[in-house]
């Protein structure tokens, strides 16, 4: 199963299209800051988050719960595709609905192997993957 989370007006064939607003007439209406998500554990093979993550999870606990839910619903070896604006680009800075910059390093905090490597060398990076039992691996920049 493939899901297009925060789809807005970009409804995709072959995906379950989910958005917070009924206005978009998507398959599922659900707020991504409300938990749990309406999917069974280990049921999703692909997640698309296109220009979504920067709009949700302003509070650290909420953002971590979003990551926990993504991890819960994904099968082993699932693919999560994330598109976000660069945090220093005018597109990010000028939109008042952008509440959190999303960076490669920030997402890497949820990679257990990197967490362990950082701990061995005394890096100051917070090992969120180890703390919250989330293990995402970055495969493409």
Model-derived features: positions:
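S-adenosyl-L-methionine-dependent methyltransferase catalytic module, highlighting the catalytic core
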Residues: 57-65, 69-71, 75, 79-141
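Conserved SAM-binding loop
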Residues: 2-86
């Amino acid at each position: 199963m493939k899901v297009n989370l925060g789809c807005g007006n970009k409804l995709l064939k072959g995906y379950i299209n989910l958005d917070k607003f009924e206005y978009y007439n998507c398959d599922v209406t659900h707020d991504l800051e409300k938990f749990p998500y309406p999917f069974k554990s280990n049921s999703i093979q692909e997640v698309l988050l296109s220009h979504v993550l920067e709009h949700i999870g302003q509070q650290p606990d909420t953002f971590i719960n979003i990551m926990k839910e993504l991890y819960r619903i994904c099968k082993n070896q699932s693919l999560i595709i994330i598109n976000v604006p660069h945090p220093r680009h005018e597109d990010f800075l000028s939109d008042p609905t952008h509440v959190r910059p999303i960076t490669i390093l920030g997402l890497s905090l949820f990679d257990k192997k990197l967490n362990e490597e950082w701990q061995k060398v005394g890096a100051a990076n917070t090992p969120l993957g180890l703390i919250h039992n989330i293990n995402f691996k970055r495969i493409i920049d």
